Amino acid sequence: MPRYRLLIEYNGGPYQGWMRLPGLQTVQGALEAAAAQLDGGPVEVTGAGRTDAGVHATGQVAHMDLRVDRPNKVADAMNYHLRPHPIAVLKADRVEEDFHARFSAIARHYRYIVINRRAHLTHDQGLAWRVPSRLDADKMHEAAQSFVGTHDFTTFRDSECQALSPVKTLTRLDVARYNDRIEFTCSAPSFIHRQVRSLVGSLVEVGRGRHPVKWAREILEAADRTRCGPVAPSDGLFLERVDYPAG
């Protein structure tokens, strides 16, 4: 059967995460229901990133196998059957049968958005974390560089994480301020459960002035989950892009 690669965006607010769960509304479940209507039978949709409840995506990638062999129609047909879900298939391409959205990926890129102001959120409600106290973005960026590279991220590993190893390689963790908007950009081949939100929550503690810059390295080297700062809420996290080998 033809295999299709999907580029997907969604507002994760209404969903209990990506993964299909009996009796709960999930992104994978909504996509599989739409694909079943398109293809006339059960379809498994496999995603590159298994985002948590409330986490959004602007560049999630998934694959599925269909009996339908109409590449130019798949995206429009999926979007028709997805209504009124806040999920959109931006693109659908035929790919080789050995392409796997999760296991073929070589990098994943996340962005976390903080709105640093006292006033409550309006347009960004549900799409950012509002932090009313003034944050020092330069100190957060400096502290973040302690996390770049290959490390044991036990401190930032959720207790529910099922990964075999806490060792991961961050290739980028930048923090930048744009007026009252602060963006955390994080890239790695793969992540452990809630790693990005754990990192952001700890960096915000530095930004608030509750800990010095050197604290970031200290808690990393401690390899102790109890040393992690508060986990940032899911609202501000976006899976922005997934990379694959050229060709």
Swiss-Prot record:
Name listed for the protein in its UniProt record: tRNA pseudouridine synthase A
PANTHER family tied to this protein: PSEUDOURIDYLATE SYNTHASE, TRNA PSEUDOURIDINE SYNTHASE-LIKE 1
Keyword Calcium applies: no
Keywords assigned by UniProt, alphabetized: Isomerase, tRNA processing
A single BP term in Gene Ontology: tRNA pseudouridine synthesis
Matching NCBIfam families: hisT_truA (TIGR00071)
Record lineage: Bacteria, Pseudomonadati, Pseudomonadota, Alphaproteobacteria, Hyphomonadales
Active site positions, chain numbering: 52
Family that this chain belongs to: Belongs to the tRNA pseudouridine synthase TruA family.
Stored HAMAP family: TruA
Residues annotated to bind substrate: 110
Quaternary data: Homodimer.
Top-level taxon of the source organism: Bacteria
Catalytic activity: uridine(38/39/40) in tRNA = pseudouridine(38/39/40) in tRNA
Matches recorded under Pfam families: PseudoU_synth_1
EC number: 5.4.99.12
MF GO annotations: RNA binding; tRNA pseudouridine(38-40) synthase activity
Function description: Formation of pseudouridine at positions 38, 39 and 40 in the anticodon stem and loop of transfer RNAs.
